[in-house]
Design a protein with these regions (language model features):
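Residues within well-ordered alpha helices
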Residues: 35, 55-58, 139
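Alpha-helix boundary/N-cap detector
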Residues: 46, 50, 109-112
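Short amphipathic recognition helices of helix-turn-helix/homeodomain-type DNA-binding modules
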Residues: 1-41
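Extended, domain-scale alpha-helical bundle/helix-rich regions
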Residues: 44, 50-69, 73-76
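Conserved binding/catalytic microenvironments
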Residues: 72-176
Length: 176
């Protein structure tokens, strides 16, 4: 009897996994996967199941169905349009900003220091982007802010976003 119970439980688990995979395949179709693969965010593939596994890893979830709320809690963003696909593109872009921000070393958040370096930051805008970006990253990093520059994903209508990740503030900007 125990053997029959084990076989039954295994079949139920497989059926559940197959149903979840089918649900995740339909969700994966909404993401701009080919653009994400072109940018190197996920491995390129044409197989739906591989896309699901790659997106699960990218979003750090066991099932894509868990991404019902596509936004990072507390995210503030600037975008100039909206459609159903734009939310998925925004979620992918914001997740990449989150992942990249984890590799940036920052001091603890210090708003007073930020206030004191704002004039220096404004002065950097007069310089060439190649020279001011490293300086800007350093100044903001000393204030507990990680700045991430990411390419624009078509359909996201996104210019930038800010959110808190761990113990630092993240500013993500699109590069157009």
């Amino acid at each position: 009897w125990n053997n029959l119970e084990a076989i039954y439980r295994e079949k139920v688990a497989r059926a559940t996994d197959e149903n979840e995979l089918e649900e995740d395949i339909s969700i994966a179709k909404e993401f701009p996967y080919s653009k994400m693969a072109t940018l190197g965010w996920v491995p390129p593939t044409r197989k739906a199941e591989e896309k699901v596994w790659n997106l699960r890893g990218f979003f750090e979830v066991a099932r894509l169905g868990l991404l019902e709320i596509l936004r990072i809690p507390g995210i503030a963003y600037r975008k100039v349009g909206e459609n159903s696909k734009s939310n998925y593109a925004l979620a992918a872009w914001a997740q990449k900003a989150r992942l990249d921000s984890r590799t940036i070393l920052t001091s603890p958040v210090n708003i007073d220091k930020l206030s004191s370096v704002l004039s220096d930051i404004r002065a950097l805008t007069l310089e060439d982007p190649e020279s001011f970006c490293p300086k800007l990253r350093q100044l903001l990093g000393e204030c507990g802010i990680a700045i991430v520059f990411l390419p624009h994903i078509s359909g996201s209508f996104l210019h930038g976003a800010t959110f808190i990740e761990g113990n630092h503030i993240v500013i993500g900007l699109t590069v157009r």
